[in-house]
Amino acid sequence: NDFDVASLNEIKLIKRINSEVNLHFMHTIKSKESISSAYFDYGVRSFSLDNKDELRKILEATNQAKDLKLFVRIAISNEHAEIDLSKKFGALTSEALGLVRLAKEYSKKLGISFHVGSQCMEKISYSKGLREIGNIIKKTKIIPDIINVGGGFPAIYPDLKPEPLVKYMEEIKKGIKNLRLNKLPEIICEPGRAIVAESGSSIVKVILRKKQNLYINDGTYGSLFD
């Protein structure tokens, strides 16, 4: 049971529900206090970064821990996504090369990750991201222990009809195969939207019953809009 988390509040929430789950703190910009609490209070060992300052912060906040899983997030094109995250998060390949080498020195397990952007409508974006990881592997001669292909898997909306999720997984498998590695790293992903976007829950109060009609304190212009 693994969960991607982006804040200390998410960590606390999940740990209250199940204290045994494995958490990955994959936000690349974290406060030193949240890193320290995640590590010492909640047993988090996986942290994401996209710059040297964040790496330094992680090491300081964990007292130079020797059991860290450090994920270097690289920036890739988000051209096929509804929400572009590439300008905000991720290291350019030119910067990632040195960052991968540096993170390797301080991690028990090294990961490389990317994110194709939210609600990605073209599965080829994932193989492009894997191709960029392949370029980094060739230039650094470092094979990561873990590759995280991130999230961005699309859900169905009234004006957006993506291909089935299995097609995205097939594209990822193809991209991994094209890396041509003798030993494959562990492959993980963050499929949150694709799993839960079409579900939801609401708590409402019945104000009036008129024969077979119930009138509640919510409606089309509230949480029932979708």
What kind of feature is each model-predicted range?
Residues 122-226:
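C-terminal active-site-proximal or functional interface alpha/beta core segments in diverse enzymes
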Residues 1-146:
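Active-site-proximal beta-alpha core segment in soluble small-molecule metabolic enzymes
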